[in-house]
C-alpha cells in the first residue's frame, strides 16, 4: 500500500481483489467513454476483469475508500506490461494517472522487470505526449482488429527502461 497526497487528497494504491471486479469494470468503462468515437460498446466487463485477475492483476487507487483509478499489470519475464489505465473522469487532471504509472513502474521494479511496455490506440492523440513526458518511447505498431471498431485503428507500442 502506498500513500501520496495529491490535490489535498490521500491516494492509497493497493493490489486489487476479486471482489473489486465490478467496480473496476465500471471505472474502466467510464474512463474509456472518450473512445466512443471509434469503438462501440463497453471496454470491459466484470467477467473479463476476473479473467485478467486470474492471469495477473490490477492496481487500484483510492481516495478515502473511493476507487478513483486502476491499471492492469502483468509481468512478462523481464518486462512488465500495463494497460487499461483508468482514472475517474471527475478526478482527471489531478495527477492520479501519473502517480498510478509511477506506482506501476515501482511494482514492476520490485518484480525484477528491466522495462515496461504499453500499447495505445493511435486515434487517442492525447496519449503519446502524456507517455513521452513519463519517459516512454514509440517502438512500433500492431494491428487492432476488433469487431467493435467503428473506424480503422492500430496500436502504437511504447516502452520504457526501468
Task: Please annotate each region the language model reported.
Residues 50, 58, 114-162:
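C-terminal "cap" of GNAT-fold acetyltransferases
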Amino acid at each position: 500500500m502506498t500513500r501520496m497526497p495529491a490535490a489535498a487528497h490521500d491516494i492509497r494504491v493497493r493490489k486489487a481483489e476479486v471482489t473489486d471486479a465490478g467496480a473496476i469494470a465500471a471505472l474502466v468503462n467510464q474512463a474509456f467513454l472518450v473512445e466512443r468515437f471509434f469503438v462501440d460498446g463497453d471496454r470491459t466487463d466484470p467477467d473479463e476483469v476476473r479473467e485478467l485477475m486470474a492471469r495477473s492483476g490490477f492496481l487500484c487507487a483510492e481516495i478515502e475508500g473511493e476507487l478513483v483509478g486502476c491499471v492492469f499489470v502483468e509481468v512478462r519475464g523481464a518486462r512488465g506490461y500495463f494497460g487499461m489505465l483508468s482514472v475517474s473522469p471527475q478526478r482527471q487532471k489531478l495527477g492520479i494517472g501519473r502517480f498510478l504509472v509511477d506506482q506501476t513502474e515501482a511494482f514492476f521494479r520490485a518484480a525484477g522487470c528491466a522495462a515496461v511496455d504499453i500499447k495505445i490506440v493511435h486515434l487517442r492523440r492525447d496519449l503519446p505526449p502524456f507517455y513521452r513526458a513519463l519517459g516512454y518511447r514509440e517502438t512500433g505498431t500492431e494491428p487492432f482488429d476488433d469487431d467493435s471498431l467503428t473506424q480503422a485503428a492500430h496500436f502504437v507500442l511504447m516502452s520504457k527502461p526501468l
